[in-house]
């Protein structure tokens, strides 16, 4: 029988146990794919057992949820008051999830590791945790990365969608709402167009007017310290750059798809950082993704079934004693933010 520091697990769980709320909840789940047994290799397939827990299976699916924008636990979400509502006057979301669990749930340990995906990357609990009978859930929270967390076109379909190997969340979009953001371009050279990024991800918003850069400010920076202090080396005149969808300053392609790019008259210098402050339109209510992460864990820990007709049973019902969030790097930043908002 594997051994671990039970007291450590209990202490961590005590700090990070989700509490249920009637004003924010998953109302429906759809299981898109089930592999049982899982982790098989070879031909004919050999399917491993893990300690006393035996064989495992995986489930891929989607959670449909709704948020009461007036509930204090949700009202702290930026711009939720502006979000579109459903017939119940709730704000909705759809989040993907991936479950790793024992086939025989009587062998489950009661510990659920709710892993935070890093830029959409799916997380699978390791073999040592499977040997304990632990359960793993990876679910979507990031609604603004158009690459690894791109939302499937048929995400709202009540029928199964083709499984993908990443996590995503569909959050509300504020149509017609404008706001100011900044983006960066680094390590680029030459006269070709360069995409606007933030933290390595393409910015998923269109400028209010892609044909004009009025009101936008493009600055050049030569140094940045570890504590974020940036040395400004000047401002690029608006006559010397433009929004584009590719090409060059002299022959720009129109802005029709994301990510939005910049074309620079004098070209880009790889030794410099370019930072643009500009107005965009149709932002996401990104905090709904944070609430979705909260609600998915709450559903799997507390609920017996969803609200659909006929209802879909919770595949983890009655098996979870402790739900523990964890993450590192970007996922660690999310975990800290999650706890700071009081969503655990």
Give the ranges of each region predicted by the language model:
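Bacterial N-terminal signal peptides that target proteins for export
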Residues: 1-9
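Bacterial N-terminal signal peptides
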Residues: 9-18
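Sec/Tat signal peptide C-region and signal peptidase I cleavage site
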Residues: 18-24
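C-terminal His-loop and adjacent cap/lid subdomain of alpha/beta-hydrolase
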Residues: 24-344
């Amino acid at each position: 029988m594997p051994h671990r520091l039970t007291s450590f697990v209990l202490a961590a769980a005590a700090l990070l146990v989700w509490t249920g709320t009637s004003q924010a909840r998953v109302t429906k789940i759809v299981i898109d794919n089930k592999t049982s047994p899982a982790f098989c290799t070879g031909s004919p397939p050999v399917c491993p057992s893990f300690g006393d827990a035996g064989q495992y299976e995986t489930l891929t699916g989607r959670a449909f949820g709704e948020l009461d924008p007036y509930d204090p636990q949700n009202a702290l979400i930026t711009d939720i008051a502006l979000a579109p509502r459903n017939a119940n006057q709730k704000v909705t979301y759809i989040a993907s999830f991936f479950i790793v669990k024992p086939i025989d749930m009587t062998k489950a340990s009661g510990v659920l590791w709710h892993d935070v995906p890093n830029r959409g990357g799916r997380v699978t609990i390791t073999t040592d945790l499977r040997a304990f009978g632990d359960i793993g859930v990876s679910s979507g929270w990031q609604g603004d990365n158009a690459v690894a967390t791109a939302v499937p076109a048929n995400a709202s379909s009540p029928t199964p969608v083709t499984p993908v190997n990443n996590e995503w969340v569909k959050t509300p979009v504020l149509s017609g709402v404008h706001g100011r953001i900044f983006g960066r371009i680094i390590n680029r050279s030459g006269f070709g167009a360069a995409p606007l990024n933030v933290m390595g991800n393409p910015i998923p918003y269109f400028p209010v007017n892609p044909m004009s850069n009025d009101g936008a400010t493009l600055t050049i920076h030569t140094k940045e310290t570890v504590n974020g202090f940036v040395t400004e080396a000047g401002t690029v005149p608006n006559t010397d750059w433009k929004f584009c969808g590719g090409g060059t300053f002299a022959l720009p392609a129109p802005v029709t798809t994301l990510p939005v790019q910049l074309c620079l008259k004098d070209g880009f210098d790889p030794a410099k950082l370019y930072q643009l402050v500009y107005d965009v339109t149709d932002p996401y209510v990104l905090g709904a993704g944070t609430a979705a992460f909260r609600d998915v864990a709450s559903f799997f820990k507390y609920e017996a079934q969803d609200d659909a007709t006929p209802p879909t049973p919770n595949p983890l019902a009655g098996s979870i004693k402790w739900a523990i969030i964890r993450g590192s790097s970007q996922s660690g930043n999310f975990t800290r933010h999650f706890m700071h908002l009081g969503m655990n």
